[in-house]
UniProtKB/Swiss-Prot annotation:
It comes from the Eukaryota. Necessary for centrosome duplication; the function also seems to involve cep63, cdk5rap2 and wdr62 through a stepwise assembled complex at the centrosome that recruits cdk2 required for centriole duplication. Acts as a molecular scaffold facilitating the interaction of plk4 and cpap, 2 molecules involved in centriole formation. Also plays a key role in deuterosome-mediated centriole amplification in multiciliated that can generate more than 100 centrioles. Overexpression of cep152 can drive amplification of centrioles. Residues 1-60, 1383-1408, 1595-1628 are annotated as: Disordered. This is Centrosomal protein of 152 kDa. Residues 1603-1613 have a biased composition (Polar residues). GO terms for cellular component: centriole; centrosome; cytoplasm; deuterosome; pericentriolar material. Residues 44-57 have a biased composition (Low complexity). Keywords: Cilium biogenesis/degradation, Coiled coil, Cytoplasm, Cytoskeleton. It is found in: Cytoplasm, Cytoskeleton, Microtubule organizing center, Centrosome; Cytoplasm, Cytoskeleton, Microtubule organizing center, Centrosome, Centriole. It comes from Xenopus laevis (African clawed frog). GO terms for biological process: cell projection organization; centriole replication; de novo centriole assembly involved in multi-ciliated epithelial cell differentiation. Residues 266-516, 571-664, 696-796, 843-886, 946-977, 1014-1047, 1182-1288 form a coiled coil.
Length: 1663
């Protein structure tokens, strides 16, 4: 009857087309081979298989695995497992096979819907009711895996965790009468619950994303150890039962009958013989079965041996290659050490120089402060300031005096203009008055002539009439005429006096014109007329001209100044942006500090979780004690259990004490961490202080530069003012000379004109003489006529009077005597009056004629003078108009600009007010004159009214005379006008030509002057610019040199301090490692747990770091101890197998004795092993060592960060120094230019006094040019100063940036070099430590050897540590691995939990077959050829579903090998890990617990090919900086994590060993395979084409993931796990030996540096 293997359970998931058919065929062949085996072979294999069973029927396996699991994670708080305890019979009893075998399947079913940890421990384990399951781990469906050696079956779920120890898959059904081979020992029967347990189960639907198809199952034979134990327990009972039957038959027979007695005896003997025969037959059959089984095992072992020989040859070749590589690396290391030494010396020199520069700077600053404080400098400054203030005051006073002079001159000019205007108005008024007087005189003459005629007519009429009344009327008229004559005479006198005054003024005017005052005043009038018309002064004109010249010549300068201002604004914005960036950097640093604080809190939380796990382990220990008390074997072996319990309790107390010590260490570590934070904060404060000091120095330097530039500006300004003033004075003199020459020419021309005028005057005098002669003739003739008329009138009057007297006498004589007397009196009176009237009339007529002649002469003279004046005025007006036109054309722009000036408007208002006042005065005067004239006219008219009658006659006479005079005057005036017109036309032509010539000459001269002035200004400005640029360059160079020297000194000092501090830290760490190694060595030699020492010396290291260092070292030593024990147990079991086989063939009857001896030997062995295994401290110390390493890495990362920051600051300082040097050069150049300008000033100041006394007319013209040039120079100087300021600011900003970059690069370089050296030394030491020379020596020797190797490792670690090339690929591609982070964070917990499982029952060593190895090699070759053609979807599906290594990938992640989750071709490479080696599990896994998180990010989960289709070469072009928040371990890969080709070796070698040496063989194979892997991993990996691996390392690094991993890496598991449990749990997943072709492919690949200096340098070329 054959066992029914469920074919459905053996099928694998075939959801993709990429399933390997060859692997499936091999699976089918293996299935057929197992089903065809006979029952006896299966029985033998069940009892004799050394492999641990994965089936649920193996209650013994469960009972032994679970306590080991618990012991791994909580070695300090849990009891030792039961299978390790020595019993009296020498066997290890199974305490749980009867108790919970039936419940296991039910429990596994209940685990599906619960929360799962990464290692399968149920979160809700505290709520479990059954006490049988409180002490073991629970596993969900995810942990049930197929145990076939090809490893094709896997789960496609996303929440895959590490495999458990007990399979929850559907199991095969054992027959009811099945009994294993017992070797004549009693076999324990399975209880009825076994049948229920053997039933397969379907996975519940509650588990998300998990396939519900049946699981694949491999036949797992029953373990020999269980069989032996059951035989020991059950054989005595079976024997006792048989003898009781015989005794009963014997006693029941009749005692009387002898025949019956004999028959019965014979029957008994026969039965006894039959039983003996049966027993012999059974033994024979059993021996045959055993022989068959051993033959079968021998064949398997031979095949394994062939494979091992091949692998040994390959490993030897790889070892040789690795040794060559090691020699090369040593050479490189020595070279690097030399470079490091040279760099350290350079750093020391730089620091010394930096210190010197700092001291010099401080001394200079102190000297500057002292100089500032010193009284002499203050006095000099005060004197300088006083001198400057005095000069400014003098300058201002001079300016004010000049302005006052100008104002006075302008006022004088205005007054003269007013006088001229008044004189002109007076002349006009006088002319008008003269015209009016002429008109009045003509009217009077006309009237007089008329009155004469009328009087003559009246006289004639009177003479004719001769009446007395007429005579009286005539007398009255005569009286009136006489009175009017008197009035006219007075008016004539007044008019003559006014005419004299005007003549005197005209003579004065003519004399002034002859002397040249008129020309000068006319020249002044040229300016004054235009100014009067515009209402402005010469000062404003000068300013306006200055502004115009600035506007014309300084356009480019203004534009350049605006551009400079814009540049200044942009530079100011850049400085503000740098400050903002620095502030942002400070904020980032604060955020990082907060992140580190959060990390510390998370570490504290992890400590709390560890304490919780310790409590859980205590609870589990109590549960174990309860289980032991309640177990069915307690009654039989209570004494042993009590002893074991006492031992466990004692160990528990010791572990509790150690735990308390560790807590103290943790507290000390926290204190050290706080100290480190404080030191970091102090460093940050120092950095801030340095930055503030630098900013303050920068500000002081800028202020100093500003002061120097201001002083320089003032000096240059004064110098330029003096130079320009001198130039302008000289130019003014030249212009004044030119103008004077022109004035002389004009005077000469005026003299000629005066000569002509003199000729004209002579002609006029001749005419006047002729006129006088004519007037005299006319007067004589008129006098004669008057005399004649008078004589005639007198004669007529006498006759008339005589007649009247005669008549009156006659009448009077006749009338009366009285009347005669009266009449006589009246007549006498009348005669007197008439005579008098006649005489008066004659004299009056003569006088009037004289007056008229004089008036005519005067009028002619006045007309001549007036013509001359008009000609002169017209000449002056024309010249002034021409000059004004030229001036208006030349200064048209200035006039346009001037109207907008406020001063112009104010002056206009003033001039308008003055003009209005003068007009008002003139109007008042004119009104008063008009009133006076009107009064006179009125009086004259009133007088004339009385004499109208008399004057008619005189008027007729006068009219006749006037007509004659007018005719003569008109003739003379016509002659004069004709002569004057001819002379005026000639003179106008000549003057017009001369004015045009003068105008052209003036324009030419003005243009030449402007061109020369502009050229001079441009030359001076260009020279000033050149000198200013030179000084600026010199100042900048000087400042750069000073800054460079200071930076060099500061860098040297800083490098020295940092190197000393790093050396001190390294020395302290190494001393602590040595001391810990000595203590571990003493503990191992004494075989007793010694209390941990507190740190004796006061070290700067953290207490937690020291504690972790101790823990790591102890853990490594414990791993070596376990290896040694495993080797010893394996050797002993081999010997015992051989002896037992010999004894079974020879002795049949002495079986019980041999069994007793065997049990005694086993008991003694277990007792020795129990003694040796009571020291589980080493593993805990290894864990603590790893924690300390992590702390060390964290501290190093912080130090590197600080170094980076310092390096950046140094770079900034260098940049600032360069900028300062440039500024210094610039300032020196400016100083030189300043000195040159001062020399020029001194040279030019000497002739300046002579130039300071110019002519007033010239000074007005040159002040404008002077002011214009000053404004231009000032604008250019302000531009230059602003540009220098901008350059300084920009230089400071750039220097800061350069110093920061330099600091970063230097710190990064140092950090990378030291990290690389550290990792190299550490890996080499681990490699040497993990090497096993194959000497099967005693346990103590091996322990001593391991301790000595650890001590040498600690000595080697004294060299500086760094990671130069590892950071090159850690800073990229992290956003792609978020899905993988969720897995690796769970797996990271499982990394710590399975840390202490199976030492004897190793599930790694099962189900490895040669067929599966060959299949895997073929698959690797095929997938390597097709690896680059994988698409995104295919790559993802291949990794997610059809890959044959999902559980192995998880196990590799859990074992710190999460670096290896690469894309398709590399999946085969990752399986060659030294999973069998317990030493690797102890040391290397703990070394890479921290790197597992980081390496988990190197290659994310199976979704990786979706993002990167195919494998690509990744060439790093720049050195990346390690992320501060990432993992602290930069180790790319552990020595075990890449290739572990010897994992199958251990499992296959165990198949041919006896059933009793299974546990020992597990450890021996693990040690052998690990040593081979450690010796060959560098060489083997050197040929691997894994460029893509390191490319993905560079691309998958992320801050968040690194932070998560770094936080979760230190969380201990919820329950205790042996560090080897995860290592041993991966063999069933299908480890594969590399074929020779595969190795050749690896070695042929080119080597390319990926940036990681790892033991696998050629993996970067994987394509």
């Amino acid at each position: 009857m054959s066992i029914d293997f469920d074919s459905g359970a053996l099928q694998t998931q075939q959801e993709d087309e990429e399933y390997d058919k060859e692997d499936y065929a091999r699976e089918q062949e293996l299935q057929q081979l197992l089903t065809d085996l006979p029952h006896d072979m299966l029985d033998d294999s069940l009892s004799s298989s050394p492999e641990p069973s994965y089936s649920d029927c193996s209650g013994h396996e469960i009972s032994e695995k679970i306590p080991q699991w618990e012991h791994g994670a909580n070695w300090g708080n849990d009891d030792l497992p039961n299978h390790q305890k020595p019993y009296k019979n020498g066997f290890t009893e199974n305490q749980y096979c009867m108790g919970f075998v039936g419940k296991q399947d039910e429990h596994l079913r209940n685990q599906a819907g619960r929360d799962k940890m990464s290692n399968g421990w149920d979160v809700l384990h505290a709520n479990e009711d059954d006490p049988m399951f409180n002490g073991k781990y629970r596993y969900s469906k995810d942990h049930a895996y197929n145990s076939e050696s090809n490893g094709q079956a896997f789960h496609g779920g996303d929440h895959y965790d590490a495999p458990g120890h007990c399979s929850s898959s559907e199991l095969y059904h054992l027959p009811d009468d099945f009994q294993p081979y017992t070797n004549c020992q009693q076999v324990e029967h399975f209880p009825d619950s076994k049948k229920e347990h053997f039933q397969g189960f379907a996975v519940p639907e509650e588990t998300s994303k998990i396939s519900t198809e049946p699981f694949q199952v491999k036949y797992n034979p029953y373990q020999i150890k269980v069989a032996r134990m059951d035989e020991m327990n059950q054989d005595p009972e079976r024997r006792d039962g048989n003898f009781d039957d015989l005794q009963r038959e014997f006693l029941d027979t009749g005692e009387n009958s002898t025949g019956n007695m004999q028959f019965v005896q014979l029957q008994v003997l026969y039965k006894a013989r039959g039983r003996q025969l049966e027993e012999q037959n059974n033994k024979l059959e059993e021996s045959e079965r055993q022989i068959r089984y051993l033959n079968h095992q021998l064949a398997i072992v031979k095949d394994q041996k062939d494979g091992l020989t091949i692998s040994l040859q390959e490993s030897q070749s790889l070892l040789q290659n690795s040794r060559e590589m090691e020699i090369q690396l040593k050479g490189q290391l020595t070279a690097l050490e030399k470079t490091v030494e040279s760099l350290t010396t350079n750093e020391e020199q730089l620091r010394k120089e930096l210190n010197i520069s700092k001291v010099a700077m401080e001394s200079f600053q102190q000297q500057l402060l002292d100089l500032r404080r010193s009284e002499s400098i203050q006095r000099a400054r005060e004197q300088h300031e006083t001198v400057v203030s005095m000069l400014k005051k003098k300058h201002e006073e001079q300016v004010l005096a000049l302005q006052q002079k100008l104002d006075d001159v302008n006022a004088m000019l205005n007054e003269e203009k007013e006088l001229c205007s008044r004189l002109e108005t007076r002349l006009k008024l006088s002319e008008r008055k003269e015209a009016e007087s002429k008109l009045e005189k003509t009217d009077i003459i006309n009237r007089l002539s008329k009155s004469l005629e009328e009087s003559q007519k009246q006289c004639a009429n009177l003479l004719q009439s001769g009446s007395i009344q007429e005579a009286t009327q005539l007398r009255l008229q005569l009286q009136q005429v006489q009175s009017s004559k008197i009035i006219n005479d007075g008016m004539n006198k007044a008019l003559q006096e006014e005419v004299r005054e005007l003549q005197e003024q005209i003579t004065m005017y003519e004399s002034a014109a002859r002397l040249g005052a008129f020309v000068n005043s006319g020249e002044e009038q040229q300016l004054s007329d235009s100014y009067v018309e515009l209402g402005i002064k010469n000062f404003n004109w000068q300013k306006s001209r200055l502004g115009r010249i600035v506007a014309n010549n300084g356009v480019k300068n203004d534009l350049s100044s605006e551009e400079i201002i814009l540049e200044l604004k942009t530079e100011l914005e850049r400085c503000l942006n740098s400050n903002k960036t620095k502030r942002k950097q400070i904020v980032q640093l604060q955020a990082e500090l907060k992140g580190h604080l959060l990390k510390n809190e998370e570490l504290k939380k992890s400590m709390e979780i560890a304490e919780r796990t310790a409590r859980d382990s205590q609870i589990q220990a109590e549960n174990l004690a309860n289980k032991v008390n309640n177990s069915p074997f307690y009654s039989s072996s209570s004494d042993r259990f009590r002893e074991e319990i006492q031992k466990l309790q004692s160990e528990k107390q010791i572990l509790q004490q150690e735990n308390e010590k560790h807590l103290l260490f943790i507290k000390e570590f926290t204190v050290n961490e706080e100290k480190l934070k404080a030191s970091n904060q102090e460093l940050c404060n120092e950095m801030r202080g340095m930055i503030q000091d630098f900013d303050q120095d920068k500000k002081e330097a800028i202020e100093r530069c500003e002061r120097t530039y201001e002083q320089h500006n003032e000096d240059i300004k004064a110098h330029l003012l003096n130079e320009l003033y001198e130039k302008f004075e000289s130019e003014k003199e030249l212009l004044s000379q030119g103008y004077e020459e022109k004035i002389t020419l004009l005077q000469a021309q005026m003299n000629e004109i005066h000569r002509e005028m003199a000729a004209v005057q002579e002609c006029y005098i001749a005419v006047c003489k002729e006129k006088d002669a004519l007037e005299e003739n006319m007067r004589e003739h008129f006098k004669k006529e008057l005399q004649k008329s008078e004589e005639e009138v007198t004669a007529k009057a006498i006759q008339d009077v005589e007649m009247e007297w005669a008549q009156k006498l006659n009448q009077a004589l006749q009338d009366a005597k009285t009347k005669s007397l009266q009449s006589f009196e009246t007549q006498t009176i009348q005669t007197d009056e008439s005579s008098l009237a006649k005489s008066d009339l004659n004299s009056d007529c003569i006088d009037e004629l004289k007056v008229k002649l004089q008036n005519a002469i005067q009028e002619k003279e006045k007309a001549v003078h007036q013509a001359q004046l008009e000609l002169e005025e017209r000449h002056h007006e024309e010249t002034s108009k021409q000059v004004e036109v030229a001036l208006t054309r030349a200064y048209g722009r200035w006039l346009q600009e001037l109207t907008s000036l406020p001063e112009y408007k104010a002056r206009l208002k003033l001039e308008q007010e003055k003009w209005e006042k003068t007009n008002e005065r003139n109007v008042e005067r004119q009104v008063s004159d008009a009133l006076y004239a009107a009064e006179i006219k009125w009086k004259m008219r009133s007088d004339k009214v009385d004499f109208t009658v008399r004057q008619k006659e005189f008027e007729e006479k006068i009219a006749s005379m006037k007509r004659e005079l007018e005719l003569k005057a008109e003739e003379s005036q016509a002659l004069l006008k004709a002569e004057i017109a001819t002379s005026r036309a000639q003179w106008n032509k000549e003057k017009h030509d001369e004015i045009q010539r003068l105008r052209e000459d003036n324009e030419k001269d003005y243009r030449v002057f402007l061109d020369e002035h502009r050229n001079k200004l441009t030359d001076t400005l260009s020279t000033a610019k050149v000198e200013f640029e030179k000084q600026k360059n010199e100042l900048i160079a000087q400042k750069d040199r000073e800054m460079a020297e200071r930076l060099d000194e500061s860098l040297k000092q800083w490098a020295l301090d940092e190197s000393r501090r790093m050396r001190a830290l390294e020395n302290e760490i190494l001393s602590e490692v040595e001391q810990c190694m000595y203590e571990i060595h003493d503990q191992l030699l004494d075989k007793s747990i010694v209390k941990d020492r507190l740190p004796s010396m006061k070290s700067n290291l953290d207490v937690t770091f020291l504690e972790k260092l101790k823990a790591c070292l102890q853990k490594s030593v414990k791993g070596i101890l376990y290896k040694v024990l495993a080797n010893a147990r394996q050797d002993w079991k081999k010997k015992y197998d051989t002896e037992s086989n010999q004894e079974t063939g020879i002795r049949g009857g002495e079986l019980e004795g041999s069994d007793d001896r065997k049990t005694a030997k086993m008991w003694y062995l277990d007792k020795d092993l129990g003694k040796t295994e009571k020291q589980p401290c080493c593993e805990h110390w290894v864990q603590q060592l790893e924690k300390s390493k992590k702390e060390c890495y964290e501290i190093r990362s912080k130090l590197e960060k600080a170094c980076r920051h310092l390096q950046q600051l140094v770079k900034e300082q260098k940049l600032k120094a360069e900028k300062y040097r440039k500024n210094h050069i610039l300032t020196e150049e400016l100083k030189k230019q300043n000195s040159e300008l001062q020399k020029k000033l001194e040279l030019t100041v000497a002739p300046s006094p002579a130039c300071l006394e110019p002519v007033e007319g010239g000074s007005n013209g040159c002040m404008m040019c002077n002011g214009n040039a000053l404004e231009e120079i000032r604008a250019q100087y302000i531009k230059a100063v602003d540009k220098i300021k901008n350059d300084m600011l920009r230089y400071i900003h750039e220097s800061k940036g350069r110093a920061a970059e330099l600091l970063k690069s230097e710190v990064l370089r140092e950090r990378q070099e030291t990290a690389r050296k550290m990792r190299k030394y550490y890996l080499t030491c681990l490699q040497q430590l993990l090497k096993d020379d194959g000497n099967n020596e005693g346990a103590e020797k091996k322990i001593i050897n391991a301790a000595s190797k650890l001590a040498t490792m600690a000595k080697v670690l004294e060299t500086p540590v760094s990671q130069k090339y590892q950071s090159k690929s850690l800073n990229s591609d992290l956003p792609q691995n978020e899905n993988f982070l969720s897995e690796t964070t769970q797996d990271q917990r499982s990394l710590q939990k399975p840390a202490h499982s199976h030492q004897n029952n190793n599930p790694l060593n099962q189900n490895i077959d040669q067929q599966t190895i060959e299949e895997l090699i073929k698959r690797h070759v095929r997938e390597k050829s097709d690896g680059n053609k994988v698409t995104d979807a295919e790559g993802a599906s291949a990794i997610n579903e059809n890959s044959s290594f999902p559980t192995l990938r998880k196990s590799l992640v859990d074992n710190g090998n999460s670096q290896f989750v690469p894309s398709a071709p590399f999946q085969k490479l990752k399986t060659f890990s030294c999973i069998d080696s317990s030493t690797e599990g102890v040391l290397v896994t703990h070394q890479n617990k921290q790197s597992a998180l980081q390496s988990g990010t190197l290659y994310p989960n199976s979704e990786h090919p979706k993002k990167k289709p195919g494998l690509q070469r990744f060439d790093l072009q720049e050195t990346p900086v390690r992320d501060e928040n990432g993992s602290n371990d930069w180790s790319c890969i552990s020595s075990k994590s890449l290739f572990q080709p010897h994992s199958a070796k251990g499992s296959l070698t165990q198949l041919k060993m006896g059933p009793q040496n299974a546990d020992v063989e597990e450890h021996s194979s693990a040690v052998a395979s690990c040593s081979l892997a450690e010796e060959n991993h560098n060489t083997f990996s050197s040929g691997a084409r894994n460029q893509h691996f390191f490319a993905q390392v560079a691309k998958r690094k992320d801050e968040n993931s690194g932070r998560k991993y770094s936080n979760k890496i230190q969380e201990p598991s919820a329950t205790g796990i042996h560090p080897e449990s995860k290592l041993f749990s991966d063999v069933g997943q299908g480890n594969k030996l590399p074929s020779r072709k595969l190795l050749l492919d690896f070695t042929l690949s080119p080597q390319q540096d990926s940036g990681f200096d790892s033991p696998f340098p050629n993996l970067n070329n994987f394509n």
